[in-house]
């Protein structure tokens, strides 16, 4: 049985301050192939990640805590995340985008609400029950959630999305469900964190439109 998001987070945090370094891999990868381990773990490494966006075999890349966490204040400011934020997020922490955002919110003392199953009716219930005001989902899940929303929700002020494209047609759907929201689409990589971002006012259907650098 796969570990819950809560269990994944506890396991990741449990390695902090120990000699062990966790390696973040896709949920369907049970172990790291020895062929990827080509060098010693560098001093100060807090985790290992697999390079993303490559057509070839991914490479194992180690990151220090500072290379990752030092960017939290910048991304939180751009996305409007504060200690009062109540964000809904769904998905495994094997996706480093989820892990990054979880820890950036926790660093502020913000609240994270999640649900394990891919069930938009459950998501809608949890969002309403916990007075969520921000969403973080990949675009395909955002579309699913917006279609299942039984009524518009003015409480949602921020929508974060990444890893997939999001066009103007998608924004019409999202704005109908969350009329007072501002949507941020970002592009990033496990080995680099966030790279570029744009808001819903800047989105179009041109796949080359990736926004401005962080």
Regions found by a protein language model. Name each.
Residues 1-16, 90-108:
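Conserved coil-to-alpha-helix start sites within the AMP-binding
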Residues 3-7, 22-33, 110-130, 139-141:
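ATP-dependent adenylate-forming carboxylate-activation enzymes
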Residues 4, 35-50, 80-87:
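Conserved pre-ATP/AMP-binding loop-to-beta segment of ANL
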Residues 134, 148-206:
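Gly/Ser/Thr-rich phosphate-binding loop
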């Amino acid at each position: 049985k796969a570990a819950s998001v809560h269990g994944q987070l506890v396991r990741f945090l449990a390695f902090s301050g120990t000699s062990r370094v966790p390696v973040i891999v896709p949920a369907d990868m049970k172990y790291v192939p020895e062929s990827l381990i080509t060098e010693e773990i560098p001093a100060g490494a807090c985790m290992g990640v697999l390079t993303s966006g490559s057509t070839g075999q991914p490479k194992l890349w180690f990151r220090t805590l500072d290379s990752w966490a030092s960017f939290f204040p910048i991304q939180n400011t751009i996305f409007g995340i504060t200690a009062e934020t109540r964000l809904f997020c769904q998905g495994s922490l094997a996706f480093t985008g989820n892990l990054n955002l979880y820890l950036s919110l926790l660093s502020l003392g913000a609240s994270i609400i999640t649900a394990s199953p891919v069930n938009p009716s459950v998501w809608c219930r949890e969002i309403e029950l916990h007075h969520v005001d921000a969403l973080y989902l990949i675009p395909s899940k955002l579309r699913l959630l917006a279609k299942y929303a039984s009524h518009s929700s003015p409480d949602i002020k921020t929508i974060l999305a990444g890893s997939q494209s999001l066009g103007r047609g998608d924004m019409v759907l999202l704005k109908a469900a969350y009329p007072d929201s501002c949507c941020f689409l970002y592009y990033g990589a496990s080995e680099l964190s966030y790279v570029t971002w744009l808001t819903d006012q800047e989105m179009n259907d041109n796949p080359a439109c990736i926004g401005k650098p962080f």
